[in-house]
């Protein structure tokens, strides 16, 4: 069993310190996000937990402070399903932070029943892609000011199943929870690709990561047979701490090729659709149109 886990989980460690650095982690109250915050705080970073549920965020911050001596963690309200909340969060960051060296777009919803965001977008596309797209847009000036800086978009190993349905991005014609989810995860990689090409010369690096198959709260909407598999074959599934390895690898390893996709702490091959520069450019333009912004 230990041999199998060795194939599934690539162990990785680093002694890099982050004293004087500031990081934002979305969806930081549980799972991979919480473990990411813990590691960054342990390296001396000031870490902002960007969370929708402040009660859960307070508990996460308390847990981290117990594990990490003198942890510099701060809680901020962020609802990625509401552009007004995203604007308020960004305004608060500019008013309270002098720099931002690391933005980890980790939050996500998965395979949930059909619903829409406050702005009318299908929830998985709206939160997983558009919410983080808008957040990154609003924080880009601070990231550029703090360069060298890094943006990390958490995608998924299931992105090859995805297709960008430009004619029905919000799944209004035909909603299927899995199709909507994999579309959003493919969008994460296309966004990474396009953003990297635009900001590399400004000192901002951008990476997409696959955390692997991880046992987290995001599985709560999965069908019962899949939940049974997760529980039965748990030894094959990463812990949240293990799921954070690749995010941390990209955050802490210097000179990695920007715009690339990483899995198990190494650069990985993504699907043909995820390498389509025309789709990446089109998704960028459509996302700007949907959000009512101009981002050149």
Tell me the role of every PLM-derived stretch.
Residues 2-223, 292-296:
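Rossmann-fold NAD(P)H-dependent dehydrogenase/reductase core
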Residues 24, 58-61, 91, 193, ...:
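Residues within alpha-helical segments
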Residues 184, 208, 231-279, 285:
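C-terminal helical subdomain
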Residues 280-296:
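Amphipathic terminal alpha-helices
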């Amino acid at each position: 069993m230990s041999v199998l886990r060795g194939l599934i989980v690539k162990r990785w460690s680093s002694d890099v310190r982050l004293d004087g650095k500031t990081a934002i982690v979305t969806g930081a109250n549980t799972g991979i996000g919480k473990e990411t915050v813990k590691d960054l705080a342990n390296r001396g970073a000031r870490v902002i937990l960007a969370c929708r549920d402040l009660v859960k965020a307070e508990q996460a911050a308390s847990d981290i402070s117990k594990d990490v001596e003198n942890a510099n963690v701060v809680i901020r309200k962020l609802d990625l399903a509401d552009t007004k909340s995203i604007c308020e969060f960004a305004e608060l960051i500019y008013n309270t932070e002098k720099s931002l060296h690391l933005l980890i777009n980790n939050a996500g919803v998965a395979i949930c029943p059909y619903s829409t965001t406050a702005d009318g977008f299908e929830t998985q596309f709206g939160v997983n892609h558009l919410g983080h797209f808008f957040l990154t847009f609003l924080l880009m000036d601070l990231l550029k000011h703090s360069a060298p800086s890094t943006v990390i978009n958490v995608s998924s190993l299931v992105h090859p199943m995805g297709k960008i349905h430009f004619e029905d991005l919000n799944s209004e014609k035909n909603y299927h929870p899995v199709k909507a989810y994999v579309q959003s995860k493919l969008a994460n990689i296309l966004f990474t690709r396009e953003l990297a090409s635009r900001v590399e010369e400004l000192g901002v690096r951008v990476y997409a990561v696959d955390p692997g198959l991880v046992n987290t709260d995001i599985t709560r909407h999965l069908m019962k047979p899949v939940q049974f598999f997760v529980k039965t074959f748990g030894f094959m599934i990463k812990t949240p701490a293990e799921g954070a390895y690749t995010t941390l690898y990209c955050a802490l390893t210097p000179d990695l090729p920007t715009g690339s996709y990483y899995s198990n702490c190494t650069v990985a091959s993504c699907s043909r659709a995820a390498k389509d520069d025309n789709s990446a450019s089109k998704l960028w333009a459509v996302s700007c149109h949907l959000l009512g912004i101009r981002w050149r």
